[in-house]
Amino acid sequence: MLSVALVVKMVAKEETKDEVASFLSGAVEMANAESGTPVWFALRTDEHTFWIVDAFPGAGERQAHLDGPIAAALMANADRLLAEPPSISPADVLASKVTT
């Protein structure tokens, strides 16, 4: 059962918007390798605005994800890629439906 989540907003610089999109598209492989991250989405809502929404069974798995390779790669390149620091909001999962 999913109990906690993260909602991360990223605003790319004009000159790096395609690179941010490419990074997020490729990051799914890292997310797939995280056994404690059963739900992970990378979304784009406009030309410059990107989101990561992911959900976890518990706070330990969420923290492991925050300490993992996706966050490390993002933070290592945030100043170069993003127009502002990423907004990382922890959330509680009230309800969920994920099917494939």
Predicted regions and their residues:
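An amphipathic, aromatic/His-enriched active-site/gating alpha helix that lines ligand/cofactor pockets
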Residues: 26-39, 55-89
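Glycine-rich beta-strand-turn "strand-cap" elements at beta-sheet edges
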Residues: 1-5, 9, 39-48, 73-100
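Short hydrophobic/aromatic beta-strand micro-patches
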Residues: 9-11, 53-55
